[in-house]
């Protein structure tokens, strides 16, 4: 009886293992509705990595190079691995303050990037962005003209898709070597935060 039972148990275990093996594929099966257009909003912090420009330092001023940041973006996901995205980001203020005076610089950026995604599970992906930016720099000094700068931007993050139309991101992005000329100087701006994504179909 035992000799007859052992082959039967072995066959049963082998049959049960086949569906599990078939499910363990890479990349994972895709969540529904991941293709097509999407829009989103981002919230977090921005930091001018090189501090305050020389033009607004001195005179006993203290530099505050970090500020709340928000952004809006729209994109189109071509397939599970690639998307294209345009975005606007308010990079906040850099402030140099003293007991009797203060100077501020406000920065905002438009960007156009390619997005590469790496699926980890059915709903969770890592991603990277690479593209270009155009930054507007504005001073609180009325006699100083605004400045524009263009350059490269890149980002790393993770995305979770709910399975419906919504997704959530955590993301770090750098706007590299923002060159505003003699007054504004050169700075790197980093943003760190979360974003909510809504798929339009």
Segments (PLM) and residue ranges:
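Bacterial N-terminal signal peptides that target proteins for export
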Residues: 1-7
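Bacterial N-terminal signal peptides
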Residues: 7-15
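Gram-negative outer-membrane beta-barrel domains
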Residues: 18-201
């Amino acid at each position: 009886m035992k000799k007859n039972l052992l082959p039967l148990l072995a066959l049963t275990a082998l049959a049960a293992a086949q569906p599990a093996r078939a499910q363990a594929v890479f990349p994972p099966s895709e969540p529904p509705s991941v293709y097509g257009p999407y829009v989103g909003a981002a919230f977090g912090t921005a930091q001018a990595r090189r501090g305050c420009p020389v033009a607004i330092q001195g005179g006993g001023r203290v530099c505050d190079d970090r500020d709340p940041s928000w952004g809006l973006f729209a994109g189109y996901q071509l397939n599970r691995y690639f998307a294209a995205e345009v975005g606007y980001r308010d990079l906040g203020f850099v402030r140099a303050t003293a007991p009797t005076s203060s100077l501020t610089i406000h920065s905002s950026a438009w960007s156009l990037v390619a997005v590469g995604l790496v699926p980890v599970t059915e709903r969770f992906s890592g991603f990277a962005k690479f593209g270009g930016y155009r930054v507007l720099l504005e001073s609180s000094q009325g006699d100083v003209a605004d400045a524009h700068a263009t350059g490269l931007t890149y980002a790393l993050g993770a995305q979770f898709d709910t399975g419906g139309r919504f997704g959530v991101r955590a993301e770090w992005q750098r706007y590299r070597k923002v060159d505003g000329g003699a007054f504004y100087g050169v700075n790197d701006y980093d943003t760190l935060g979360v974003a909510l994504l809504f798929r339009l179909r």
